[in-house]
């Protein structure tokens, strides 16, 4: 539980760093389309980092099995969804966009798993 909160807080801090990097450093170097893609990565990164903090908090009230798989799926989603968008923009490797939906599916699966686990209690 505590580890999920720590990971979520660390990833939230990293999302702020990436957001500032996008606003201050990349703003004049990227096309408006690429900047929007980068900002989408930052936005979903932050949403799901906050989700990890929430799940860690829920872990203090429920059995840790309730949050384990959902939290893993959100973490994987941040790495694949946001990570692929960051790499797509920063390296120009457009093929990274093909793996972005895998991260999106991981986000969806994480939230659905949380629903199912909480309902089963």
Tell where the protein language model's regions lie, with residue ranges.
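Polytopic transmembrane helical bundles with strong interfacial aromatic enrichment
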Residues: 1-121
